[in-house]
């Protein structure tokens, strides 16, 4: 069965170069896999997440058309951008699998005192932010998607670490210590690749 394209969404203060190790691992195991890692400039967190999700919608439509099915992976803030695209831009209709890694789906205390007028994108990740509340109210849109959340309990960027989970799907702690290690440590890379390349029926449990 042909694999769907896999879209990789980077987080705050990062670029698609962040995924070099993961991309290498994925392509070594599955050379025919189509990977797409768009650059979403956050301007140090000043750009609201909804604006970034709208940019993502334009980029995905330009790359794949408006209906081509795909899989989605989001690291950190990228996971919240991806979820916003899924739930507010109709992405749920074309997405088979959604995997988030160290992503503040339930907010993070690290963003709690950030002023929204200066850093709206970071403020969107506050615990109880308007964006996260609205996404939770429409969480049923994720029901048809194979959802998975990976996190580390010792994360101090998404703090507390257990808040880095979607309201649907499986949840698994990754045996690394820091937020950054989630996307660069060999153990984490191997685990993420296992999940992204697994068959849907195998990954769901």
Q: What spans do the regions from the language model cover?
A:
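Proline/glycine-enriched tight loop/beta-turn segments at coil->beta junctions
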Residues: 1-5
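Serine-dependent carboxylesterase/thioesterase catalytic core
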Residues: 6-10, 17, 27, 33-46, ...
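Short amphipathic alpha-helix
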Residues: 22-25
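C-terminal catalytic-base region of ester-bond hydrolases, centering on the histidine
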Residues: 14, 142-205
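Hydrophobic alpha-helical membrane-insertion segments
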Residues: 19-20, 48, 111, 161-164, ...
């Amino acid at each position: 069965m042909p694999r769907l394209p896999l879209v990789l969404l980077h987080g705050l203060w990062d670029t698609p170069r962040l995924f070099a190790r993961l991309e290498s691992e994925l392509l070594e195991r599955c050379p025919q896999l189509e990977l797409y890692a768009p650059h979403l400039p956050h301007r140090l967190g000043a750009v609201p997440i909804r604006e970034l999700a709208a940019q993502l919608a334009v980029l995905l439509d330009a790359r794949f058309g408006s209906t081509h099915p795909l899989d989605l992976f989001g690291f950190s803030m990228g996971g919240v951008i991806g979820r916003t695209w899924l739930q507010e831009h109709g992405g749920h209709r074309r997405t088979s699998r959604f995997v988030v890694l160290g992503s503040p789906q339930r907010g993070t205390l690290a963003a709690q005192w950030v002023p929204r007028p200066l850093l709206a994108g970071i403020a969107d990740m506050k615990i109880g932010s308007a964006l996260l509340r609205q996404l939770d109210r429409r969480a049923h849109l994720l029901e048809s998607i194979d959802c998975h959340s990976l996190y580390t309990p010792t994360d101090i960027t998404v703090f507390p670490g257990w808040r880095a989970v979607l309201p649907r799907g499986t949840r698994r702690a990754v045996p690394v210590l820091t937020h950054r290690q989630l996307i660069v440590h060999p153990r984490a890379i191997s685990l993420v690749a296992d999940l992204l390349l697994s068959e849907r029926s195998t990954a769901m449990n």
